[in-house]
Amino acid sequence: MPQVDPELFDRGQFQAELALKASPIAAFKKAIRLAGEVLDKRFSAGSDIRPLIEARAWLVDNILQQAWNQFDWGDQSGIALVAVGGYGRGELHPHSDIDLLILLGAAEHEQYRDAIERFLTLLWDIGLEVGQSVRTVDECAEQARADLTVITNLMESRTIAGPEALRQRMLEVTSTAHMWPSKEFFLAKRAELKARHHKYNDTEYNLEPNVKGSPGGLRDIQTVLWVARRQYGTLNLHALAGEGFLLESENELLASSQDFLWKVRYALHMLAGRAEDRLLFDHQRSIATLLGYSDENPKRAIEQFMQQYYRVVMSISQLCDLIIQHFEEVILADEESGSTQPLNARFRLHDGYIEAAHPNVFKRTPFAMLEIFVLMAQHPEIKGVRADTVRLLREHRHLIDDTFRTDIRNTSLFIELFKCEIGIHRNLRRMNRYGILGRYLPEFGLIVGQMQHDLFHIYTVDAHTLNLIKHLRKLQYTPVSEKFPLASKLMGRLPKPELIYLAGLYHDIGKGRQGDHSEIGAVDAQKFCERHQLPAWDSRLIVWLVQNHLVMSTTAQRKDLSDPQVINDFALHVGDETRLDYLYVLTVADINATNPSLWNSWRASLLRQLYTETKRALRRGLENPLDREEQIRQTQSSALDILVREGTDPDDVEQLWAQLGDDYFLKHTAADVAWHTDAILQQPADGGPLVLIKETTQREFEGGTQIFIYAPDQHDFFAVTVAAMSQLNLNIHDARIITSSSQFTLDTYIVLDNDGGSIGDNPQRVKQIRDGLTEALRNPEDYPTIIQRRVPRQLKHFDFPPQVTILNDAQRPVTILEITAPDRPGLLARLGRIFLEFDLSLQNAKIATLGERVEDVFFITDADNQPLSDPQLCSRLQEAIVQQLQAGQGSDTSQTRVTF
C-alpha cells in the first residue's frame, strides 16, 4: 500500500478544512468524492490495477483514522478499529464493502458505547459502505469457532486505530492451536467451494458470469490463499510459490489473471455506480470499450473481451484445481497411504490417482502426454491425475509440435481414445483443461473461450463441443434413452460410433473465422482425417457431417414437411440411410448441447417427422418420389377407415372433403383428418367458430398442443387469431392455413405454453384458451388489443438490424417472406396486423425462436390467392415490417432483399 499520496489525500489540508467547518460531514464527503475521481481517472488512463485498489484501501484507512479521532475514546487500551475481509487484505474496489471489526478487550465496555454509535453514524453520514461488527476478543473466538465465514474474515485483518496488541490477542485465541486445524479448515473450504461452483452450474462459461463467485473467479484465488494461510501462515501468491505449491511461471500467470479480473470488477463498480460483481449484458459492451477492445478486429470488441475473460477464468480454475489437489495430497495425507501400483513403464497408480513413474516421462516419451488419457479411459477406476503429474503435463506441452502431431504413435493414440467404451468426454475435458487438446489440435485451441454474443449459444464453442460429445455418450444410458428414444436407438446401431464423436469434435471448429464455419470446419476435418490416416469412407462421412451438420435442423424448422418435394430434396441431399442415421443423432446432440431450453417436444417431433419421411423416401427409391395425388389418396383412405369404424356416414365425409382442397390433406395426418372431420360434421350450422384443442403426446406433434380452428373465412382471421393467442400467453411454433372452396378456413396451430411446455391435461387452461379464441373469432370487430409487454432485460442488449427477404417460390404459387429479427413480446401479433393492412392471405408459416432472435418463414398470397408480383407493393410491405420490428429499438438499418 502507498506510504503517502497527497493527490489522493492530503492529511494536513484535510485537517485544516475540518477546523474551518462546524460539521465534519461535508469535508469528509468532499475528500472521498475527489479521491474517487482521481482513482477513476487513473483507471481510465490505464494505470496498473493493483496500486489502484491498494490506494483506495489506503485512502479509506486515512478517512477512518480521521473519523475515529473525532471522538473521545477515553482509555484507548481496551478498544481497536480493525479492518477485516477484503479490506483487511488491503484491497478495495470503488463500491466494495468496508468490513470493520470494533474489537473490545473486555466484556464490560459501557464507556465506549456512545462513541461507537456516533462513530458508526458518522461513517454512514459521509457515505461509506460499511459492514461492521462489535465484539470482544472472547466473542471473536466463540463466533469464529462456530462460523467458517467469521474465522475466514478474522484471518485477514489489520489494525486501523487503537492498540495492535488487541488484534494479536484475537489472532492467538483463533489460531489453529485452539480451533479450525488446517485439515478441518481445508475440508470446510473445499465443500464451500464446491457448493459455490454448483450455484453457478459448475462452469466458468456462464453468459453473465460473476467475476467474484463464478468458477475461476476471484473467490477461487482467495480460497487457495485462505487454506494456505491456515496451513502455512502465508497469505500471498509469491509466498505460496516459495512453499513449492506454485512454480514462478504459475505465480505470474495467476497474478496477471487476478489483475485482469480486478480491472473488470473495478470497471463494473465504476459503470454501475454501486457494488456489482455480475458481468451482465448491460455492462459487457461498455467494459470492452473501456478496456481498449475494438470492433476493428474481425471479432467484435465484446467477443474479444469475453473470450479473454473466459480464458483467464479457465486459467485460474486450472491452477486453483492444481493447488487444491496439492493441498489435498499434503493436508489429508494418511500416514498409511502411499500405496502404488504400476500401470506400465511410464505410469503408476498412487492411491487411485495416476501419476508419472518419474519426472522425465514426458520429456523422454512425449507420446505419453496422450497415452495418459487413453489409460484413464481404459481404466475407469482411476480417480484422476496427481497434482505433480498435472504440472509435468503443463510444463511439457510445448513439446506438442507439428512433428508430434504427425507421429503415428500419437495419431493412433488419439483415435484410440474415441474407440473407448467409456470416458471419452471426461478425458477430452481433462485434455482441454490441461491445455493438451488445444496444443494437439491448434484449430481447437482457436475456439477455447470463444463466446458468441447471443442468447442462443449459452456456452463457449469449446464447452459446447465437449457438451455435444457428452450428450452423444448419454444417448447410450437408460434414463436419457427414454427422453430420446429414436436417437438412442440409432446411436446404438451406428457401425462406427467413433466417427460421430470425431464429427462432433469438428462440427463448430470453424467458428470465429471469417466465412461459413461449416465449410471451414470441413476443410479442417479433411486435414485431420488425412493426418490420422483414416479410411476413405470414414473420412468422407466425417467431412460430410461437419459440412452438413445444420442442414437437418434448418430443414425441419424452416421448410414445409408436408410437401413431398421438400422430403425428396432432403433425401436427395442425404443420399443414404447410414448418413441419415448419423446426421439425425448429431443434430439431436447439437441442439441439446447448444442450449438445453431449445429442446422441446415440438422440435423433437419435427426432426422425427423429417427423419421418418426421409427414410421412407430413401427406401422407396429417390427415382420414385411419392407424388401429391398418391399421398392424398393414402391420407384419405386411412382417415375414412377410422371414421367408418366410428360410425360416420361415408357420404357425409365425401361431401365435406370435396370442399377442402388438396393442401389440407397434404398438411395433415390421417388421424388428424378423421378428428377434424368428425368434429366438423357434428358442428351445428350456426354454431359459430369451432375451436378444437388436442393434447398430442401420442401423435405426430408429441408434447406440443394442436389447436384446430374451423370457421367462416374472414379478412382479418389470422390477425385476430394470433393477437388472441398473444393475449393468452401462447407461443406459436407452426401455422397451417387452409381455406376451403366453401370459404371456410381450416387453420391448425402448434403451440406451447409461455414456459415452453405443452398445455398438458389442465382442463382449466384448455377451457381458458378455447373460450378466449372462440370469443375473439366470434366478434372479430373487437380486434384483440396487442398487449404491450415489457421486453426482458437480457433481450434489450441484442438489438440487431432485422433481415426481411421476399421471394416467389418457383415450385408453388406463393410468395415466401423470411424474417430474422430480435425477439420481442407480441411480435407475431404485430405481423398479423401488417398482413391485415396489406390485404394478404397467409397460406403457411414456420416459426422459430432461437435465443434472442426469431427466424420466421411465411408463405403468403394476395387477396386473389396469387403470389405478390408488384415490386412497389413488396417494397412497401418490407418497409412496414421493418418499421414495426424496429419500433422502440435502437436499430436504424435493415437488410432486405426482394426477388421475383
From Swiss-Prot:
Chain spans, region Uridylyl-removing: 343-705
An annotated Gene Ontology molecular function: [protein-PII] uridylyltransferase activity
Domain HD intervals: 461-583
Entry keyword annotation includes Heme: no
GO biological process: regulation of nitrogen utilization
Modulation of this protein's activity: Uridylyltransferase (UTase) activity is inhibited by glutamine, while glutamine activates uridylyl-removing (UR) activity.
Domain ACT positions: 706-784, 816-900
EC number: 2.7.7.59, 3.1.4.-
Source superkingdom: Bacteria
Chain segments carrying region Uridylyltransferase: 1-342
Cofactors, names only: Mg(2+)
PROSITE patterns linked to this entry: ACT (PS51671), HD (PS51831)
Xref: InterPro entries: ACT-like_dom_sf, ACT_dom, HD/PDEase_dom, HD_domain, NT_sf, PII_UdlTrfase/GS_AdlTrfase, Polymerase_NTP_transf_dom, UTase/UR
Pfam families assigned: ACT (PF01842), GlnD_UR_UTase (PF08335), HD (PF01966), NTP_transf_2 (PF01909)
Catalytic activity: [protein-PII]-L-tyrosine + UTP = [protein-PII]-uridylyl-L-tyrosine + diphosphate; [protein-PII]-uridylyl-L-tyrosine + H2O = [protein-PII]-L-tyrosine + UMP + H(+)
Keywords recorded for this protein, A-Z: Hydrolase, Magnesium, Multifunctional enzyme, Nucleotidyltransferase, Repeat, Transferase
Family: Belongs to the GlnD family.
Function, as annotated: Modifies, by uridylylation and deuridylylation, the PII regulatory proteins (GlnB and homologs), in response to the nitrogen status of the cell that GlnD senses through the glutamine level. Under low glutamine levels, catalyzes the conversion of the PII proteins and UTP to PII-UMP and PPi, while under higher glutamine levels, GlnD hydrolyzes PII-UMP to PII and UMP (deuridylylation). Thus, controls uridylylation state and activity of the PII proteins, and plays an important role in the regulation of nitrogen assimilation and metabolism.
UniProt remark on domains: Has four distinct domains: an N-terminal nucleotidyltransferase (NT) domain responsible for UTase activity, a central HD domain that encodes UR activity, and two C-terminal ACT domains that seem to have a role in glutamine sensing.
Protein's name according to its UniProt entry: Bifunctional uridylyltransferase/uridylyl-removing enzyme
Protein source organism: Pseudomonas putida (strain ATCC 700007 / DSM 6899 / JCM 31910 / BCRC 17059 / LMG 24140 / F1)
Gene: glnD
